Amino acid sequence: MSNFVLHPDLERDGVLIGNFQLSRVLLINDSNYPWFVLIPEIPDTSDTIDLSKIEHERLWEESRIFGLAIMKLFNGDKLNVASLGNMTPQLHVHHIVRYQNDPAWPAPIWGKHPMTPYSELQLKRIRELFTSAELDNFTAAICNG
């Protein structure tokens, strides 16, 4: 996986939370929602059908593990999981914890409200959640500060 390069959109909007065996996990820097993306670190993939059978199974197992964890950590009402890629062609799977009182409920979040970046303290706390969480085959990003 040495040829993997993160798409500039994901680099710009994401904050590294950690890594699974296959996927990099980013927090989208929008404090309106607990919004994460899993990005399989495989070059030149834009859709799940580009993955091998084993990679495909691994991605959805990582998605299941991560989804369970974030619903518990953020006490959500609903978990939205989607792989769109219309604007950012690199394969990435959104995991968005939704609340009945969130700014866009019940509609999709895209384009509803301007992104509101997390404060450094908020980012630190979210990283600490994942440092202490025990997710199978997950390595949390180093939490500085």
Give residue spans per PLM region.
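HIT superfamily nucleotide-processing domains
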Residues: 1-91, 95-145
